[in-house]
Regions:
Chain A
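Cytochrome P450
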Residues: 1-408
Length: 408, 499
């Protein structure tokens, strides 16, 4: 019986045999609920940059220096396509799919709203949301940290950031939740995307007539150079990217970090004793250890780099979460150590596409942790409950059932 | 052996043994011969190691041997897996990967493609050779719930999905129409023009043989021949796309033709216009609009004749055993006049897609089939089909998945992005038009050669348009097909036909 191309291991002639290492980024049997540790272990013996013949065949980059070299070289490694395996008519996101300098005006338009000053100003609102969400979850005793906390918090923050009508919180949360639950259902995603964009479009109209100091009003007014403002389509596209980028990421970094924290009673006791003093260090270490985004690149110009022949049309996957656990950069990289000296990592990538929300994302985890330990004495994994996960370009924890001892 | 396709054939072999079951190019296959021949085929299959549930793939143009092989396979408890005789080796290989047949049979013109796809087919002449011979019977009877066929359908995905019917679903489908349509009793004469590898061809064959009718199989649509056949053989049932009825009416001999034998005349795939209705009404015939899809078993609803006269474009209100709803995305029923997705429920619908639990769960929810089609019910519950959610191009009655064409076109060097849309075509109704963007125009002849090598001929684009600008996108980052359709509405009038 012949096999269709999709099932084949694809190894083009330019790929040398010593760089081939089998790994299925979507469903590798070696990866478990502790995704980061098991993923790292599975590829520990693979070369720094290797060719995975599965999923149409693509390069995988696991070392921090190699990742930095590729992320800062848009001339050879383009963001134009980000699908593995490559698909016909890949989606195009503003500004994610734009190589510099085209992406710069859009980043400049967003930057002031995501800087430390703006995020600091948002903190009281983040705190209020975190408290409210944790209180609601605690009412339940045993609950799913993902569904009840990690998934709802970033949606609320997104609405706050955009200046959305918070009386529609539940409606929009429900929309967001269904969107991320139906990732494999193209028809549902299409319908839900339409509804989300409908909400955004209504928001644009509202902010045109009654502007405020929130992000959507800022998008409407932002000078893109030469006095040009963004078209409605551009604003919608940017809003959609922020929606995608702001939810799944913070949700899953938080989820994986709390999965680990649930198994570390000593660290919980320290955080309980001094949440305000230690939450920043915890957030930093959570971000270093539990990155969830792997960034694809398309080779658009042949280049030999680090002994690897990258050829036009090859797909490359930068394993940011693995790069942030590079044992050449970190002592005991798989240990969550909040006393670790702060060192650069690549969870947020680097170069022209450095995550614009990195200050906000870190702040969300920090504030959530402070509010958590105001209310929680200790918590642990609920015994014998499965913790499903998915891998791919974004790694996600789909459920995290926890048992909680509330603070007295 | 109760409520199986095989039990119905055995019944008609007893009751109407000499009546033709199938007439193909003048060659007659009686129910008695069909019964004996298919029994011998079943015994041969079992002897070759075929077990209940195994797949038997068939890649051939229509022939009486094909018919015998279908009923023999079902009698042996195996599952018929028809392969489109137009398929290219790559399409065949992709299909075989999911069906994994125990045996593959091929017609003389299909052997080479199958070999190239990596299998060693048996020759259809092996089946032909069993037309005469000693009585033979398979040692066991098929069960009602055993699957009988996997029919490949084109959906909105790039790869076809296999619709699975069982003995029980196919007999229930036939039972519904026997109850509902007294105009097609046993002994009725039916024209069928569809290849047996299509849903229409396979379902008509099995439906009308379960019902004890005679099928006149035509190798292709020829309006003059059809008109002649209807009169000469006193044909009673005729189903086709509206364009076929128009071609027949355009024949000079139509004016004096005697069509009084026709009792059940249905049209699907496109709307029946008032003008078409009136042309045939002058001959005493009411063309009735149908709606259905492979997944529901075939037809789901036929417009009642007395209502079709006033509302030719409507499709009826379901059937004796077939319920229809039109719903909003959240599953609640639409108000009369409100558009929504058409849902259907019947004992004749598929049990699911072959080895595809995700797509099955999507299509079958709480006992209802979600059609992916948009429709609207009027205040009397009569359905009007509005549009298909699935991205299909329907060319000469054959469904083409736009995504599949796009996948192959995008493989061609120099093409950055491409969409396939339907261009109107006087002969086929619709035909594929491809709009692509790249750094420069590509060699269209070479592109078409690439498509020819990887796609069945009817899927190969007939028009190719180059766009110097990137194609329009939605805010979600996806290409916008509605915007491209609008930009290229009249493109077929300006562009040359490239094949």
């Amino acid at each position: 019986m012949t096999k269709a191309p999709s099932q084949l291991r694809v190894i083009p002639p330019h790929v040398p045999a010593h760089l081939v290492f089998d790994f299925d980024i979507y469903a590798d049997a070696r990866v478990g609920s502790d995704v980061h540790q098991t993923y790292s272990a599975a590829i520990a013996d693979a070369p720094d940059v290797f060719w995975a013949p599965q999923n149409g065949g693509h390069w995988m980059v696991q070392r921090m220096d190699a990742i930095s070299a590729i992320a800062t070289d848009p001339e050879h490694f383009s963001v134009r396509e980000m699908q593995i395996p490559r698909v016909p008519n890949p989606p195009f996101f503003i500004p994610l799919s734009l190589d510099p300098p085209e992406n710069l005006p859009y980043r400049r338009a967003m930057a002031p709203m995501f800087g430390p000053v703006a995020v600091k100003a948002m903190e009281p609102r983040l705190r209020a949301w975190a408290g409210e969400i944790i209180d609601a979850a605690l009412q339940k005793g045993t609950f799913d940290f993902m569904a009840d906390v990690a998934k709802v918090f970033p949606v609320s923050v997104f609405m706050e950031l955009m200046g959305m009508d918070l009386s529609r919180l539940h409606e929009f949360r429900d929309l967001a939740e269904r969107f991320f639950e139906n990732q494999n259902d193209a028809a549902q995603i299409e319908a839900l995307s339409g509804q989300i964009l409908g909400v955004m479009k209504a928001l644009i109209d509202e902010k045109r007539s009654t502007p405020d100091d929130k992000l959507m009003s800022h998008f409407i007014q932002a000078d893109m150079g030469g006095g040009r403002t963004m078209s409605e389509d551009e604003i919608l596209a940017m809003s959609f990217v922020l929606f995608l980028g702001g939810m799944d990421t913070v949700t899953n970094v938080t989820g994986f970090a709390y999965q680990q924290l649930a198994q570390m009673p000593d660290l919980q006791a320290r955080l309980m004793a001094d949440a305000e003093g230690l939450s920043g260090a915890f957030a930093d270490e959570a971000v270093r250890m539990f990155g969830v985004v792997n960034t694809p690149r398309l080779v658009v110009k042949d280049i030999d780099l680090m002994g690897v022949p990258f050829r036009e049309g090859d797909m490359v996957l930068n394993l940011l979460p693995i790069g942030s656990r590079d044992d050449r950069k970190f002592d005991q990289p798989h240990v969550l150590d909040i006393d670790r000296k702060k060192v650069a990592h690549v969870t947020f990538s680097t170069g022209p596409h450095l995550c614009i929300g990195h200050v906000l994302g870190r702040a969300e985890i920090k504030v959530l942790t402070e509010e958590w330990f105001k209310r929680v004495q200790s918590f642990s994994l609920a015994a014998d409950k499965p913790r499903p996960f998915r891998t791919g370009t974004v790694m996600a924890l789909e459920a995290l059932p926890v048992s909680v001892n509330a603070a007295s | 052996m109760s409520q199986t396709v095989s039990s119905a054939i055995a019944w008609w072999a007893r009751m109407r043994g000499d009546q033709p079951a199938v007439v193909l190019a003048g060659e007659v296959l009686s129910y008695r011969t069909l019964q004996d021949w298919s029994d011998r085929v079943a015994a041969m299959l079992v002897g070759a190691g075929v077990e209940p549930g195994d797949r038997v793939a068939i890649c051939s143009t229509n022939s009486l041997a094909y018919v015998a092989l279908i009923f023999g396979t079902i009698r042996a408890g195996a599952i018929v897996s028809p392969i489109n005789f137009r398929y290219k080796p790559r399409e065949i290989a992709e299909l075989l990967e999911t069906t994994e047949p125990r045996l593959v049979f091929a017609g003389p013109d299909q052997v080479a493609a199958l070999r190239e796809a990596g299998v060693s087919p048996r020759d259809m002449s092996m089946v032909e050779g069993l037309r005469e011979g000693r009585r033979a019977t398979a040692a066991y009877d098929p069960e009602p719930d055993w699957p009988v066929v996997i029919i490949a359908t084109s959906g909105s995905t790039a790869k076809p999905k296999g619709v699975v019917f069982t003995n029980r679903t196919m007999t229930a489908y036939a039972a519904n129409w026997s109850i509902e349509e007294p105009s097609a009793p046993a002994g009725s004469k039916v024209i069928t023009m569809a290849p047996l590898n299509t849903s229409a061809g396979f379902v008509q064959l099995v439906h009308y043989t379960i019902a004890g009718c005679t099928l006149y199989m035509e190798p292709q649509f020829d309006p003059a021949r059809a008109l002649d056949l209807i009169q000469r053989e006193r044909i009673t049932c005729f189903a086709a796309v509206p364009a076929f009825f128009e071609f027949i009416a355009a024949r000079p001999e139509f004016a004096n033709a005697d069509l009084s034998s026709l009792k059940l005349v249905t049209a699907g795939g496109a709307r029946v216009s008032r003008q078409l209705l009136e042309t045939y009404r002058a001959k005493g015939i009411v063309i009735r609009q149908i709606y259905g899809q492979t997944e529901v078993g075939g037809n789901a609803t036929i417009m009642p004749a007395h209502l079709a006269i006033d509302m030719p474009e409507k499709c009826g209100w379901g059937g004796a055993f077939i319920d229809i709803r039109v719903v909003r995305p959240d599953g609640s029923d639409c108000a009369p006049g409100e558009q929504g997705e058409i849902l259907m429920r019947s004992p004749g619908m598929m049990i699911g897609y072959w080895r595809n639990p995700e797509e099955t769960a999507r299509a079958l929810r709480d006992g209802w089939l979600w059609s992916g089609d948009i429709g609207v019910l009027d205040e009397n519950g009569l359905l009007t089909f509005v549009d298909r959610l699935k991205d299909l191009i329907i060319s000469g009655g054959l469904n083409i998945s736009a995504a599949e064409v796009e996948r192959v076109v995008c493989e061609f060097p120099g093409i950055r992005e491409a969409l396939a849309i339907a261009a109107p075509d006087p002969k086929f109704g619709e035909t594929p038009l491809v709009v692509y963007h790249g750094d420069a125009e590509v060699d269209v002849a070479a592109l078409i050669a690439h498509c020819d090598a990887n796609l069945s001929n009817y899927k190969v684009p007939r028009y190719v348009a180059f766009s110097a600008d990137p194609l329009p996108r939605l805010a979600t980052g996806k290409l916008s097909k509605p915007a491209v359709r609008e930009l290229y509405t009249d493109a077929h009038l300006r562009l040359p036909k490239v094949r």
